């Protein structure tokens, strides 16, 4: 049965609400090094780990499985070629997808192909019977000679696919941009990045908070949601 984008959006939003109060489920996160969350957190939790603590610990969903299938350096096309291994074999109920930071190395000419691949990821995830959630990658430090400059076009592609296919969107990029603008600190809030392309511990915590808000599980009384991480804003990335 075919649904309109609006019908998909309404259905998936309701599914996520039901999942959070229903029987045990499997949550799978796919993406690149930001999802994998290695090195740049310096031993602190990545956003997927914060999610697991919030859902399995604080919300008492102990039997839930949270799978981090992120791979450093991965692009959307890599997931498509390894979809069954990185996502399908876990029989997921919900799949969170975040790519773009590496994909943008293809430049402006690569945006159309990237958008098509996201479309295919959404369709293949839905074919599994799972609910898909798209995420925009957080901003990076834009430099003319940096291989990841020009990410904004890929962020817009994620938003476009989410709107066209009725996919729930976690817009990390918008949240980071809003805070950075309020601070006058550039493309990313001060202290949220560990290097020009990777969030540090504070950045991952803020990504988790954005995810919680999108899913409606943010709570000021939660230890995870109210955690504070001190950052050194005097040292440039």
Predicted features, each with a name:
Residues 10, 21, 49-62, 75-236:
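Alpha-helical cap/lid subdomain in secreted, periplasmic
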Residues 1-72, 83-91:
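Serine-esterase "nucleophile elbow" of acetyl-processing enzymes
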């Amino acid at each position: 049965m075919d649904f309109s984008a609006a019908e998909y959006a309404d259905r998936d939003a309701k599914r996520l609400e039901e999942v959070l109060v229903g029987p045990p489920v499997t949550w799978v996160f796919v993406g690149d090094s930001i999802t994998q969350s290695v090195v740049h957190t310096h031993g602190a939790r990545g956003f997927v780990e914060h999610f697991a603590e919030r859902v399995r610990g604080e919300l008492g969903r102990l039997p839930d499985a949270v799978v981090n299938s992120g791979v450093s350096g991965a692009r959307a096309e890599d997931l498509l070629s390894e979809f069954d291994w990185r996502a399908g074999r876990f029989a997921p109920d919900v799949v969170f997808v975040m790519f773009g930071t590496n994909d943008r190395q293809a430049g402006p000419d690569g945006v159309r192909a990237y958008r098509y691949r996201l479309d295919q990821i959404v369709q293949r995830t839905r074919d599994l019977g799972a609910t898909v959630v798209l995420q925009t990658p957080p901003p990076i430090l834009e430099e003319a000679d940096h291989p990841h400059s020009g990410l904004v076009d890929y962020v817009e592609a994620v938003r476009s696919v989410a709107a066209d296919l009725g996919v729930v969107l976690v817009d990390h990029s918008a949240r980071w941009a809003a805070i950075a603008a309020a601070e006058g600190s550039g493309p990313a809030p001060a202290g949220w990045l560990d290097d020009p392309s990777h969030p540090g511990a504070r950045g991952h915590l803020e990504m988790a908070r954005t995810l919680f808000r999108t899913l409606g599980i943010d709570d000021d009384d939660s230890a995870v949601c109210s955690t504070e991480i001190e950052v050194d804003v005097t040292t440039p990335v």
